[in-house]
């Protein structure tokens, strides 16, 4: 068990993979000072909040992750979905367009953008 705690992000990912989201959230919060500028950590924490249906708390993690690594399509897609949960259609459209600038053949973003622009 010592090995997992030598690699705290690995332990955090394992908790998420095992579906222990509440425990992962608590453990992740304890790592925040050490990993506050790590885009992978920020993505994981935002993802946990998103899974726990707290898009409002997920958003700052996604935003900071994208400030550090602005070409991360996975983070942009989760941020898009968080905007949708928060009923922020225009922000979701902006995210879809950013995804398509990075990956013009991203069918998920393309389909979602078409749907959002037609409503």
Predicted regions and their residues:
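Helix-start (N-cap) detector for alpha-helical repeat units in TPR-like alpha-solenoids
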Residues: 4-5, 39-40, 73-74, 107-108
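Conserved structural position within tetratricopeptide repeats
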Residues: 29-33, 63-67, 100-101
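Register position in tetratricopeptide repeats
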Residues: 17-18, 51-52, 85, 115-119
């Amino acid at each position: 068990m010592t090995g997992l705690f030598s690699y705290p992000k690995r332990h955090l990912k394992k908790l998420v993979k095992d579906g222990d989201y509440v425990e992962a959230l608590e453990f992740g919060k304890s790592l925040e000072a050490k990993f506050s500028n790590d885009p992978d950590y920020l993505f994981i924490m935002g993802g946990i909040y998103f899974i726990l249906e707290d898009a409002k708390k997920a958003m700052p993690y996604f935003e900071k992750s994208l400030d550090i690594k602005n070409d991360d399509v996975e983070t942009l897609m989760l941020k898009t979905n968080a905007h949708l949960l928060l009923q922020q259609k225009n922000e979701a459209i902006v995210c879809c367009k950013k995804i398509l600038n990075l990956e013009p053949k991203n069918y998920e973003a393309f389909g979602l953008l078409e749907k959002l622009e037609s409503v």
